[in-house]
Amino acid sequence: MAPKMKRVLLTAAAVILCSNAAFAAFFRPDVRPGYGVSRRGWLSDYHAPLKGTNLDAPVYYIEGEKPGAAMVVLGGTHPREIAGHTAALMLVENAKVLEGRLIVIPALNVSGYGIHDQSSNIARFHRVPCRSGHRLLPFGDRRVDRSDQSADPQQYRHQSGAVILGSKGHDGAEARNINRNYPGLPDGTPTQQAAYAVMEMILKEKVVLAIDMHEADTPSWSYSRETGQPYHGGRLAYMLVCNPKDEAMELGAEAVVDVSDRVGIDLKYEPSNKQFRGLSHLEIGDASPCLSFLFETPNPGQDSWREAPDVVTDVRYPLNHRVGLQLEMFCELVDLYNQSHTDHLVMKHVPDYKTLMEDGIGKWLN
């Protein structure tokens, strides 16, 4: 190869690498706020050291004219779990609050959205219809980008000293999993600081109910790549995990029964495992008066046995099915809370499961 041509190729490669690095560093998911949004803030408003970093997530406030209860929706904790992010987008782009305050973080792990999912070959962006034509939904990695944090330890250890149940000592990457790092530390790793900022938001805004929207593998039979034996996946799919507080468990049980009856799907619920430290549903509820929940929908992209999963239009588990369930569950929890408290969150213009199954997601995205 001629020296001049070699220099040109090396220069082009350097430009591509720099461009990719810059893209990851400055990437923010596309959020198009509706008229109901009162203001936008940042996670760093609750913990200043996050300002200007790739862990500083946008926060959207949808506030009613009448005071009432404050509730939080967390989407995008794991950027590969696309239904939670999309459901949070629909709230930001459609919801109007009449009473109380709704606080939404559509893309909590903004760092993870800046990189490709490290466990699959699923595309970074997925084109979907919307009211203005088409838009791209992002698909990233479940953890914070390595470049935004120091090297992983060999074994992850929660700030309490606990290790992950069943750990074999090779799970150090979980140090970059926001949903293993609650309640967080003000002077900890960037991931711990992001979790700490969420806790500070919960406390300072006097949040009474929070839901963290996630996805799991699908309830399907397949063969293990390691053992070759058949197994049934998706234990967590269609699961509402409730903080063990009596009120949270009672609210969760009633919500699961009501939503199951309406949508014709057998949903499940269980209490947080107190030995599994760092998860939002356990730690948020234990560290505050908030009733904290986590809801899992089945995502084909979580199935290790699928060669080319379709995370948007899968025949059995399409995105509108999963987003509809996330919103149906959240709204049911809100309604049940309102029935037993004097302070309420009252919303309108939030699509339910039936509407999204009929309309698809396009009519509800700006």
Language-model region placement:
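Active-site/substrate-binding loop(s) of hydrolase catalytic cores
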Residues: 82-83, 98-245
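Short glycine-rich or small-residue beta-strand-to-loop segments that form or flank ligand, phosphate
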Residues: 70-76, 177-181
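Bacterial N-terminal signal peptides
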Residues: 11-20
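A short, Lys/Arg-enriched amphipathic alpha-helix followed by its capping loop at the start of a domain
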Residues: 87-100
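Glycine-rich His-Gly loop
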Residues: 64, 75-79, 215
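Proline/glycine-enriched tight loop/beta-turn segments at coil->beta junctions
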Residues: 64-70
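Di-metal (Zn2+ and/or Mg2+/Mn2+) metal-binding site signature of metallo-dependent hydrolases
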Residues: 78-86
